[in-house]
């Protein structure tokens, strides 16, 4: 009889790490523009609350340890309230940030952070 292998049961995402070129600039972007709050920080990293998950900004100039991926992030999708979509889009464009949509989907908003990481804003009930 073949014994079944243990299936690891994940329960959610704790945090996502983004390497950033300027930690202070990135903190201002995610806090001032996207409304995140600081969970905790050190000299070379800042963890931000995004709902119940965290986004960690790591200072790329201190990328001297070996734990880092060799691949790039495609994009990170952030949930928002449906009623604030148009206001959020206007605020992002007011900052001079180029936004992109998905053809045939006027409620899907893509843009880049200061380091070129792809971001998407969407709201619950919206199909990815």
Annotated model-derived regions:
Residues 1-24, 75-76, 127-128:
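N-terminal beta-strand motif that seeds the catalytic metal site of vicinal oxygen chelate
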Residues 2-5, 34, 62-65:
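A generic local structural motif
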Residues 22-37:
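Amphipathic alpha-helical segments
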Residues 37-70, 112, 118-125:
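Conserved short beta-strand elements that form part of the metal-binding/catalytic scaffold
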Residues 1-7, 13-21, 49, 66-128, ...:
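Vicinal oxygen chelate
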């Amino acid at each position: 009889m073949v014994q079944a292998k243990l299936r690891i049961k994940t329960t959610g995402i704790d945090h996502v790490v983004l390497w950033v070129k300027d930690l202070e600039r990135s903190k201002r972007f995610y806090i001032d523009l996207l409304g995140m709050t600081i969970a905790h920080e050190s000299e070379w990293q800042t963890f931000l609350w995004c709902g119940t998950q965290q986004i960690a900004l790591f200072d790329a100039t201190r990328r001297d340890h070996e734990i880092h991926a060799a691949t790039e992030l495609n994009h990170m999708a952030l949930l928002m309230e449906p009623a604030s979509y148009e206001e959020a889009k206007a605020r992002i464009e007011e900052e001079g940030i180029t936004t992109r949509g998905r053809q045939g989907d006027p409620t899907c908003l893509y843009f880049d952070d200061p380091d070129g990481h792809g971001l998407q804003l969407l709201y619950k009930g919206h199909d990815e």
